[in-house]
Design a protein with these regions (language model features):
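Non-catalytic cap/lid and distal C-terminal segments of serine-dependent acyl enzymes
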Residues: 1-191
Length: 191
């Protein structure tokens, strides 16, 4: 499994906000045989993460204009990082055993990866994906992408995160409908 925001994946002392996902503890506790390759983001003071993890250009009222370099990031994942992991670790490199996941901007990148490279990634977990970045471009990608059969996506948002944001709830519902209509095996939840 490939994961974005690697600093948040394993240990609390490395996590951006002091609380990690605890993936290593979970895998140990459940005795799950899974290799997790988690890459840290560029979490600099100038919001480089937004550039690194957005496949699209976008404008933000608070932070300004961003030239998304997410396509470059994902190309590196697919054409350099994954081959390195496959060559140096005992992986099963086929799409049936290759997953990708992340949250927020990493969730957006995970969704983008599944749509652009469903021949590489068979499953994705897009947790609280930043769909607001470029909803029109993402919707267009959902409509035109070539999907391998058996593509699986888990996508969710937190109920407190959504709160009273009717636009967020509506956008999530619309995106889920479009994804489901393409035949992706989708599990979508507000938790």
């Amino acid at each position: 499994m490939y994961m974005f925001d690697g600093q948040n994946v394993f240990f609390d002392e490395d996590a951006t906000y002091g609380k990690s996902w605890g993936v290593a503890d979970y895998l140990d506790y459940t005795d799950t045989p899974l290799i997790v390759a988690a890459v840290e983001c560029n979490a600099g003071a100038n919001n480089e993460r937004l550039v690194e993890y957005s496949p699209y250009r976008f404008d933000d009222k608070q932070y300004g204009h961003f030239d998304g370099k997410g396509k470059d990031t994902l190309n590196w994942f697919v054409h350099e990082f994954k081959p390195y992991i496959d060559a140096n670790y005992r992986t099963e490199p086929d799409r049936a055993h290759t997953f990708i996941g992340g949250s927020s901007m990493g969730g957006l990148m995970s969704l983008y990866a599944l749509l652009e490279y469903s021949d590489v990634f068979g499953r994705a977990a897009a947790l609280s994906p930043s769909l607001w970045v470029a909803p029109e471009a993402l919707t267009a990608l959902v409509g035109r992408c070539k999907l391998a059969p058996g593509t699986v996506l888990y996508m969710d948002y937190g109920s407190r995160e959504m709160g009273n944001h009717d636009g967020m709830r509506k956008g999530f519902g619309e995106m889920c409908s479009k994804i489901f209509a393409r035949g992706i095996n989708l599990t979508a939840r507000v938790v």
